């Protein structure tokens, strides 16, 4: 039976801000800083999806995250590969994956750890306004 989480310790673009439900793939520190800085002054919900190419539960969640992002287009969804942007992952202590961190005005307000789509939707509903 598979697990709904992986641990970072298990294995050692263009920026389209989403008003239409896309997930922004964060590919560089500069891109991350640009997105993060633009969200600091906003009451808009930022959902950071911490993932890795080797994370099975992350891959399983990817289509669900895209589906959820399309439903909640008032939130911004950003995917961060923990191996590519280790400093960002470290800032948010994204050790067990997938990890979904909810941020408003530059501050973490909640998180969901693991492949738990129902819990993810519940937290988005709770924090989107």
Swiss-Prot record:
The active site is at residues 55, 58. It comes from the Eukaryota. InterPro entries: Thioredoxin-like_sf (IPR036249), Thioredoxin_CS (IPR017937), Thioredoxin_domain (IPR013766), Thioredoxin_H-type-like (IPR050620). Signal peptide: none annotated. Residues 6-129 form the Thioredoxin domain. Belongs to the thioredoxin family. Plant H-type subfamily. This is Thioredoxin H7. The record marks 49 as: Deprotonates C-terminal active site Cys. It is found in: Cytoplasm. Disulfide bonds join 55-58. One of its GO terms (cellular component) is endoplasmic reticulum. It comes from Arabidopsis thaliana (Mouse-ear cress). PANTHER family: THIOREDOXIN (PTHR10438), THIOREDOXIN H7 (PTHR10438:SF448). The keyword Transport applies. It holds the Pfam family Thioredoxin. The record marks 56-57 as: Contributes to redox potential value. The keyword GTP-binding does not apply. The gene is TRX7. Keywords: Cytoplasm, Disulfide bond, Electron transport, Redox-active center, Transport. Probable thiol-disulfide oxidoreductase that may be involved in the redox regulation of a number of cytosolic enzymes.
């Amino acid at each position: 039976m598979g697990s709904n989480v992986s641990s970072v310790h298990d294995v050692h673009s263009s920026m389209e801000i989403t008003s239409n439900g896309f997930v922004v793939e964060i590919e560089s520190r500069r891109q991350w800083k640009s997105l993060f800085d633009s969200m600091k002054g906003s009451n808009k919900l930022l959902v950071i999806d911490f993932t890795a190419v080797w994370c099975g539960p992350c891959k399983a969640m990817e289509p669900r995250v895209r589906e959820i992002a399309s439903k909640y287009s008032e939130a911004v969804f950003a995917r961060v590969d923990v191996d590519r942007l280790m400093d960002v992952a470290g800032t948010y202590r994204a050790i067990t994956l997938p990890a979904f961190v909810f941020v408003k005005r530059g501050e973490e307000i909640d998180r969901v750890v693991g492949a738990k789509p129902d819990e993810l939707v519940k937290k988005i509903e709770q924090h989107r306004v």
